[in-house]
Amino acid sequence: MSLSNKTVKELRQLLKERYTVEDELTESIALSSMRFKPSQEPEFHALSQSSLLKTKLKQQSSTDIPSYTHVLISKLSCEKITHYAVRGGNIEIMGILMGFTLKDNIVVMDCFNLPVVGTETRVNAQLESYEYMVQYIDEMYNHNDGGDGRDYKGAKLNVVGWFHSHPGYDCWLSNIDIQTQDLNQRFQDPYVAIVVDPLKSLEDKILRMGAFRTIESKSDDNSATSYYELETIIFDSELNRALFETKLNLHCVIEDDESEQISLNRLIDSMKQYSYLMDSKNVRTRIKLATTSERVSNENKKNIDYQNRSTRSQFCLNTQRGDSTETSSFGSMFSGDNTSDVDMEDRNLTEFDSTDTSLCINGEPSIHVNRVERSSRSTDNFHNSKKRMNSNQERCHDEGNDMLQRNVLETDYARAKNRILASKIKQYERLRFYKDTFTL
C-alpha cells in the first residue's frame, strides 16, 4: 500500500475506514471535546470577561449581605478543574477558587490545586497545604509590591471558594463537606464550594459540575445546616473566542510510544504462540502416526498367529477324524457277523472291549480350543474397535482446540498489526499535513 501519492484527506479517510480503534476516553480527548452547559438566561448571553471586570470596577461597596444565587466561572477555570480532577483519577483532589463578587453573583476567574492527601472518598488539607496556599496567593495575585502579579484590569482577585472532586458518585456535599463549607462561610464569606465528577464527565463528555453554599435552617429546638445549589454559568474571554474562530481545526494526537511498543510486543507474542502451536501439532501428528503404525503391525501379527492357530486346529481335527475312521474299521473285524470263523461268545474281554472310545476323548479338546480362539478373536476385535473410536474422538477434540487457539491468535495478531499500522499512518498523516501547510 503506497501512501506517498495520497493526500491528507485520503489518509484521514483511510484511518477512519480501516484502522479505527475504539479506545477508552483519555485525558486529552476529555479536555478537547468537553461540552459546557450554555446559559439559559437571556441577560447572560453576552457575558464576557471584560464586561464582568468593567462592572466590578463600577460597583460601589454595599453593607447589605447579598443572597448569592449564581456562580459565574471562566472557561479557563473549568478546564483547570477538569484537568486536575481527571489527572487525579479515582482519588479526590482539592483546590482554591480565585475571583470576586458582583451583586448576587460569585465570579470565579482562576483557580489552582493544593498538595493534599486524598483517598477515593475523602480529601484532607494539612498544615503544609495552607502554607502553600498563602505563598502561592502572595506570589501570583499580590499587587501591593508591584511584582509580577496576574493583572485582571485592576480588579483584585481574592479567595472566593474551594473545589474538590467526587470520582464516580456525582456532585453533592457530604456531611464533612457541609461542615467545611459552613465553617468557611462563617469566617471568610463570600465562599462557594464547587464539586466536579471527572469519571461521569469523561463518560458523558459533558462537564458534570455543581456549585453549593450552606444555609442554616432554624427550628424550635435545634438548628441544622443544609445546603443549596447555585446556578453555574460559564463565560469566556474575547481573546479566546477570536482565537477559537481563527485557529486551525486540527486534533493533535498525543503520541504514545509505550502504546506502540505494547502493540509490537503483543504482535511478537502472537507470532511465537502460533509457531509453538504448529510445532506441538506436528509433534502430536508424528506420535499418532508412529502409534498407529505400531498398532497396525501388532494387529497383523495377531491375524497371522490366529491364522496359524486355525490351520493347526483344522489339521488336528482332520487327523483325529482319520484315526476315528480307522478305529471303526478295525472294530468291525471283531463284530458278531455270522460269516466270521471266530467264536465271540467265549472270548475274554481284552483291550479292544473298552467302553471308552478314543474319538470322543481326542475330539472334545480340539473343539473347545477352537471356540476359545474364536471368543478371544471377537474380544480383540471389540477392543480394537473401541480404541479406534476413542482415538477418533481424541483427534476431533484436539483439532477443535487447535482451531480455536489458532483463531484467537490470528485475531490478536490482526488487531496488533492494525494498531501498529494505524499509529504509523497517523504519524505520516501529521507530517504530510505540516509539509502541505507550511511549504511555500
UniProtKB/Swiss-Prot annotation:
Its cofactor is a divalent metal cation. Its main location: cytoplasm. GO terms for molecular function: deNEDDylase activity; metal ion binding; metalloendopeptidase activity; metallopeptidase activity. A motif (JAMM motif) lies at residues 164-177. It is found in: Cytoplasm; Nucleus. CDD domains: MPN_RPN11_CSN5 (cd08069). Keywords: Cytoplasm, Hydrolase, Metal-binding, Metalloprotease, Nucleus, Protease, Signalosome, Zinc. Residues 71-218 form the MPN domain. Disulfide bonds: none annotated. GO terms for cellular component: COP9 signalosome; cytoplasm; nucleus. Residues 319-341 have a biased composition (Polar residues). Residues 319-343, 375-399 are annotated as: Disordered. SUPFAM superfamilies: JAB1/MPN domain. InterPro entries: JAMM/MPN+_dom, JAMM_MPN+_peptidase_M67A, MPN. Its EC number is 3.4.-.-. The JAMM motif is essential for the protease activity of the CSN complex resulting in deneddylation of cullins. It constitutes the catalytic center of the complex. Component of a COP9 signalosome-like (CSN) complex, composed of at least RRI1/CSN5, CSN9, RRI2/CSN10, PCI8/CSN11, CSN12 and CSI1. Within this complex it probably interacts directly with CSN12. Also interacts with RPN5. Belongs to the peptidase M67A family. CSN5 subfamily. This is COP9 signalosome complex subunit 5. The gene is RRI1.
